[in-house]
Amino acid sequence: MTLNSVAARTPDGRGLFDNLTLAFGRERTAVVGRNGVGKTTLLRLVAGLAEPAEGSVTRAGTVGWLAQAQTPTDDETVADTLGVAGPLAILHRVLAGEGSLDDMAEADWTLEERMQAALAEVGLADLALDRRTADLSGGEQTRLRLAGLKLAAPDLLVLDEPTNHLDAEAGAMIADVVAEWPGGVVLVSHDRALLRRVDRIVELSSLGARVHGGGWDLYVERRDAERAAAERDLEQAERAIGRVQRETQMAQERQARRDRAGKAARANSSDPKILLDAQAQRAEESGARGQRLAERKRQAVEADLTQARERVERVRQLALAMPATGLPAGRLVLNLNEAVVTVEDDRRLLGPISLRLTGPERVAVVGPNGAGKTTLLKLIAGLVEPSAGNVERPVRAALLDQQAAMLKPDETLVEAWLRLNPQGTPNAARAALARFLFRNVQADRRVGELSGGERLRAALACVMTGAQPPQLLVLDEPTNHLDIESIEAVEAALSGYDGALVVVSHDADFIQNLRVDRTIVLKSGQLQPSTTP
């Protein structure tokens, strides 16, 4: 698979990348970059699902595609999704003695065995083939499509965020499939555990693509070294511009003194006028040459400074500072006492659960999909009330989910801030949003226009910069739709948060980097015995 001088555009004509040349073989390649840079578009070009605006794509062999979000049709069955409905019907006709000669020739006698093996490998061993795909959870649908790819065995596997919405067990299964795939793999993911299993990383930006050999940890080591070098270059450039400015000022002062001295000497000299004029012209030309040299030097140093600032600003622009909450150590933040949550038909979703948190404790909640983690977070944040038991929450709490649902798509950021902080003023809203990097006209953007990372940043701004920042922050899969740079910025911001924290995330690196104090395990709505509340 080769991309030759490829360019890509958005539907409205905005350029994503130009003159991109890449080759993909049997190695495992991850594509990383900021949201909106064109990672999914690149994958679609590789998979043959899109055509480049310029350049060409050369393919040899078969390609399998696993999209980030695929909606099954209403009548689509498990067999349809696996891609075996037709071959399976042929096999069943032959086995029932109803097959034609063509059926006999086409029958795949190992199909059922291979199909069951593929389903078992992705944790769906007992799945009925006639079951509707739409009835499966999102994670189960991803597993099912992966089983279909294992059956098809393409030469090149193309995966777009394959671990999104999967629990830790399913994410580990995806990583194993990637590591063991006999052909080539090209993937986009913000799952750093998965990125550690690849052979190389392609860093995509508006400037093109840079290829880094090795997995995620080696890439980060090189990237951090480059960032440190950029900071050093900026410091040197700032010192150089200061030095040039001082030298220029001193040279101008010396020239001014020489000019004054020359004028005084000319006025008092008895030399012929033609000689004095020649001396004045030589002095003027010498001064002009010095000024031109100084100007060229100043321009060169300013160019170095601009370049150094741009390199550093790309990193610094995501830096966030969380305001202090003033939560005292040891203060009671939350006490759940035999709390139960049920739905209208009295079906129990959660509990009974007892859990006690004190400030500024950090707790991670883990468990399989469907265990009740989101319900528990809503109970902790006060968004649902217990059907039985008691909840004590003596501090202000706020819940941020992966969609930042507290924000309305049609409102501007200033409007959102004022709605969530009704005692504030428009000037206070703009100042607060600026702290979270929404400056000037950025504060007038509508929520619906924001990327996932921007939306989470806006939600943090609205929640954390009011008169009373929450002393208990509850996070439900906050990194699901973020690029890695945004995830790292959120990690850095939350590391400086001095309140209590409860987080659900399938991102083990995110949990580790938040330095949680303990992890509680939830399964079928119950805290597991290994949990110490």
Where are these regions (language model features)?
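ABC-family P-loop ATPase nucleotide-binding domains
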Residues: 72-138, 401-472, 477
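Hydrophobic anchor residue at the start of the ABC signature
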Residues: 146, 174, 460, 479
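Conserved beta-strand
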Residues: 4-6, 15-27, 55, 336-342, ...
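Coupling and communication elements adjacent to P-loop NTPase active sites across diverse families
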Residues: 1-10, 87-142, 222-343
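Catalytic Walker B motif of ABC-type/P-loop ATPase nucleotide-binding domains
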Residues: 157-161, 166, 400, 472-477, ...
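Conserved beta-strand-loop-alpha-helix hinge in the C-terminal portion
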Residues: 75-80, 207-232, 522-533
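ABC ATPase nucleotide-binding domain signature region
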Residues: 25-29, 40-102, 200-203, 359-371, ...
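Conserved D-loop/post-Walker B switch-helix segment of ABC ATPase nucleotide-binding domains
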Residues: 168-176, 480-492, 509
